[in-house]
A protein has these predicted regions:
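Catalytic cores of nucleic-acid endonucleases
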Residues: 31-93
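Generic structural motif recognizing short loop/turn segments at the entrances and edges of beta-strands
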Residues: 13, 22-24, 55-58
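Acidic-basic catalytic patches of nuclease active cores, encompassing PD-(D/E)XK
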Residues: 1-11
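Short, surface-exposed recognition loops or helix-turn segments adjacent to catalytic cores
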Residues: 11-20, 63
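Conserved catalytic cores of phosphodiester-cleaving nucleases, focusing on short active-site segments
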Residues: 17-35
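Alpha-helix C-terminal capping segments
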Residues: 4-5, 17-19, 50-54
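Charged, structured surface patches that assemble and position nucleic-acid processing machinery
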Residues: 76-169
Length: 169
């Protein structure tokens, strides 16, 4: 995402990605349920601080493996305290790719080119490196049972409800 024009990754800073003009700050997490309440409170306070310090900014908690597609203000109760800020949001991975790229199906289009990139990568690796990878073996077995390729097997388990992914056959 940091390769998208106008954005940079936050190498060892307190944000994961931001707009070059400081109008967007984001903290990226794989799943919403990987954070406990104190982590959520800390993240909300961090994003609120960016929003307060940069008056034109919007700040996002990005959930890459969210259960739905969404882009909404983040408000709620954490540790018995109510939290809200007019420019602090939570957003799913597909919506965040859309926001940064301006392309509604950006994550889906990235997905579509992954098979070629993965094949190129695998061709350059020694096969013995993958023989000891039990996770890869489990995915291979599962994909054979479902008659899907490996990438589709992984994707259908995680992204079937995201923007554009309903177009997969």
């Amino acid at each position: 995402m940091g390769g998208i024009n106008g954005y940079e990754i936050g190498n060892l800073s307190s944000f994961d990605i931001k707009a070059n003009d400081n109008t967007l700050f984001a903290d990226i997490k794989n799943k919403h349920n990987t954070m406990n309440s104190s982590s959520a409170e800390s993240l909300f306070q961090k994003l609120s601080k960016y929003a307060d310090n940069y008056k034109e900014s919007k700040c996002y908690w990005v959930q890459i493996l969210a259960k739905n597609s969404f882009n909404e203000k983040w408000f709620g109760e954490i540790n018995g305290k109510e939290y809200s800020h007019s420019r602090v949001y939570k957003i799913s991975g597909d919506q965040f790719y859309k926001l940064l790229s301006g392309n509604e199906n950006a994550l889906f289009e990235l997905y579509k080119i992954l098979p070629e990139a993965i094949l190129d990568y695998l061709k350059n690796q020694e096969s013995e490196n993958f023989q000891n990878n039990s996770a890869l073996e489990e995915i291979k077995l599962s994909s054979k049972k479902s008659n899907r390729n490996i990438l589709n097997e992984i994707t259908f388990e995680n992204y079937s409800y995201y923007l554009g992914f309903d177009k997969l056959e």
